[in-house]
Amino acid sequence: MAPSNLPPVFNATSQDIEMLLAAQCHLGSKNLQVHMEPYLWKTRPDGINVINIGKTWEKIVLAARIIAAIDNPADICVISARPYGQRAVLKFAAHTGAVAIAGRFTPGSFTNYITRSFKEPRLIIVTDPRTDSQAIKEASYVNIPVIALCDTDSPTEFVDVAIPTNNKGRHAIGLVWWLLAREVLRLRGTLANRETEWDVVVDLYFYRDPEAEEAKELEEAKAPGVEEIGAAAVETGFGAEGWEAAGGSAFAAAASTTAPPNWEATGGDWATSTAPAEGWAGDAPAGETKW
């Protein structure tokens, strides 16, 4: 890892480096853009380009110092068309006071003043230069500086500050936005010093699948199944064998107390009690004509 050119106060802690590695921020793609080559550490035998984590931290601190230099936080616009970054930009905007655009970027938001979504930010931060290319292109038309989370294959045209990181994994995207928000709050003085822990956990910045969350809630709310009922019966000591034994004894007791009625004594002979059947011809009326 290359030595840091930052002052000692901005050096990354071992915990920050471990979090970046755990979130796989150092794993790029197999393609390498020529302008991202200075941030490359090495290429693995399987072709994956590994990003220098030290460079990633330096660019996070540089981007945080640029953001903190803007007086009005509402003049900062954070953008993410990629689903994995939408929750992160919303949380970043809530904690730093920026304006978030999560989802589709409306064309003309920076150039067409007639549109309802027209904005004039002083700085924009995008999650992926490829998916957020429309926002970067419009920012270049009106001279708005751009900070972007760039992978090894990301286009860097019109990007002023590139933060080299994995911008395709949900944990990597959420962690970089969380670190950026924490550094901004430290530079603004919201957090007393670098030793003060931020009470916001990084999990809040991670993408969550709505369908998976809904399925989890339904599974937790459903009634206990057959397995749970069987387990409860075993715990009480009254299992399936107990039910059979109890049922057999109950039926035996009922059979012994009540005897069946004597049909032979009361009914007599069925053959003698039944009247002889007459012929069908005799039942027909005399005046009825035959067809």
UniProtKB/Swiss-Prot annotation:
Keywords: Cytoplasm, Ribonucleoprotein, Ribosomal protein. The keyword Cytoplasm applies. It is found in: Cytoplasm. Gene3D superfamilies: Glucose-6-phosphate isomerase like protein, domain 1. NCBIfam families: uS2_euk_arch. Residues 256-291 are annotated as: Disordered. GO terms for biological process: ribosomal small subunit assembly; translation. SUPFAM superfamilies: Ribosomal protein S2 (SSF52313). This is Small ribosomal subunit protein uS2. Component of the small ribosomal subunit. Mature ribosomes consist of a small (40S) and a large (60S) subunit. The 40S subunit contains about 33 different proteins and 1 molecule of RNA (18S). The 60S subunit contains about 49 different proteins and 3 molecules of RNA (25S, 5.8S and 5S). Interacts with RPS21. Belongs to the universal ribosomal protein uS2 family. PROSITE patterns: RIBOSOMAL_S2_2 (PS00963). It comes from Coccidioides immitis (strain RS) (Valley fever fungus). GO terms for molecular function: structural constituent of ribosome. Its main location: cytoplasm. InterPro entries: Ribosomal_uS2, Ribosomal_uS2_C, Ribosomal_uS2_CS, Ribosomal_uS2_euk, Ribosomal_uS2_euk/arc, Ribosomal_uS2_flav_dom_sf. GO terms for cellular component: cytosolic small ribosomal subunit. CDD domains: RPS2. It comes from the Eukaryota.
